[in-house]
């Protein structure tokens, strides 16, 4: 569902050429996800990254949550290399924003250890620790009221009126992520297996694609169930569903149902109106929506029906762009996104700034994430 990652060497070489003429002070944006750690260096007064670097492999997660030591092992050398390539070796970093998948539930060690470690190693004066849904929001919408649906292997919707956050789904492939890549892929494989068995709701077209991708249908359980990356394997079949949707009604129906789930999540988190009574902005971000018209056409229809007051906007940037923009806003004292103890935390701010709330789609009362 995601684009191939560049090697650290090729990314670093490109960064040196791009960033040589830009002066500091500098900020760092960091995106830590399932496919690895990405780092962007930017100037406080700039808009685009000065340089970027991709680190190989994801940050480890253990019994204590996301491993702060392992994150630092990747982040610190990358940051120093980027500074060196910009002719600023030894310079301090004004602000850092780190967005991480699982930050809300698995980020306790990061919140405990990173503030002091980054200050000691890089002279970081200001730090923001955010969930990856928040950096996706910042990258797509910025610091305006609105809503973002981030779709890839999973699916999560996040919205804010700039006083609190609202979240819908993002509960993983066993409890939710309805309409996401793994959900679509699993539904497509279910239809294929139904066709193999002769049960109602089967799709011969999807059975043919299953056999082309995975081999004989009866062998699929033995291939799938031992895998530790089952959501990604399921999601890998989602493009096959999209490819069949133009001529197979079962595949088209799966994508219509996925679109309904995505629109439902967006509806749950979208503020009633933007600033000054403007329509709520809704952005779609992530690899899921690169499947094109088979998903986007029914999704636009569902969003228009459920959110007639909303305005669809193109996402202006990805989570790494969002992390860098949060770091810049933090450095200039202009971070307007609502704080939350686990969703967007700025260590050193008063407790009243960290006490923001998150509401879920089932409950309009504020609840902790």
Task: Please place each PLM-identified region on the residue numbering.
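ATP-binding/phosphotransfer module of carbohydrate and carboxylate kinases, centering on a glycine-rich
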Residues: 2-92, 139-145, 189-369
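Membrane helical hairpin/interfacial module
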Residues: 78, 94, 101-105
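Short acidic capping loops at alpha-helix termini that bridge into adjacent secondary structure
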Residues: 90-94, 125-126
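Glycine-rich beta-strand-to-loop/alpha-helix junction loops that act as flexible
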Residues: 97-103, 151-153, 280-291
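Phosphate-binding/catalytic loop of phosphoryl-transfer enzymes
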Residues: 103-203, 343-345, 351-353, 366
């Amino acid at each position: 569902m995601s684009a191939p990652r560049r090697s650290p060497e090729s990314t670093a070489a490109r960064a040196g050429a791009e960033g040589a003429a830009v002066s500091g002070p500098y900020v760092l944006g960091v995106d830590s996800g399932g496919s690895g750690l990405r780092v962007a260096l930017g100037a406080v007064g700039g808009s685009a990254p000065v340089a970027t670097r991709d680190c190989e492999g994801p940050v480890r997660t253990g019994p204590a949550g996301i491993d702060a030591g392992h994150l630092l092992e990747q982040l610190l050398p990358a940051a120093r290399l980027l500074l060196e390539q910009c002719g600023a070796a030894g310079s301090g970093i004004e602000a850092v924003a780190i967005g991480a998948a699982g930050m809300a539930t698995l980020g306790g060690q990061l919140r405990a250890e990173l503030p002091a470690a980054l200050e000691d190693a890089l002279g970081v004066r200001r730090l923001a620790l955010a969930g990856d849904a928040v950096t996706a929001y910042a990258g797509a919408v910025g610091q305006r009221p609105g809503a973002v649906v981030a779709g890839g292997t999973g699916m999560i919707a996040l919205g804010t009126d700039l006083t609190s956050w609202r979240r819908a789904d993002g509960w993983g492939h066993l409890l939710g992520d309805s309409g996401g890549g793994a959900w679509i892929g699993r539904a497509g494989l279910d239809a294929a297996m139904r066709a193999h068995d002769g049960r109602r709701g089967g799709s011969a077209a999807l059975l043919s694609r299953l056999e082309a991708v995975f081999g004989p249908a009866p062998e699929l359980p033995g291939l799938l169930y031992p895998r530790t990356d089952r959501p990604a394997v399921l999601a890998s079949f989602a493009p096959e569903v999209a490819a069949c949707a133009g001529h197979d009604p079962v595949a088209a129906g799966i994508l219509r149902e996925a679109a309904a789930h995505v629109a439902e999540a967006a509806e749950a988190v979208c503020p009633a109106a933007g600033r000054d009574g403007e329509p709520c902005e809704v952005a779609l971000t992530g690899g899921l929506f690169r499947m094109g018209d088979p998903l986007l056409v029914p999704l636009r229809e569902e969003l228009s029906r459920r959110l007639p007051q909303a305005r669809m906007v193109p996402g202006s940037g990805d989570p790494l762009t969002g992390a860098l923009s949060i770091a810049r806003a933090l450095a200039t004292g202009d971070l307007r996104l609502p704080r939350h103890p686990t969703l967007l935390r700025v260590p050193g701010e008063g407790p009243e700034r960290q006490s923001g709330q998150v509401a879920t789609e089932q409950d309009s009362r504020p609840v902790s994430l």
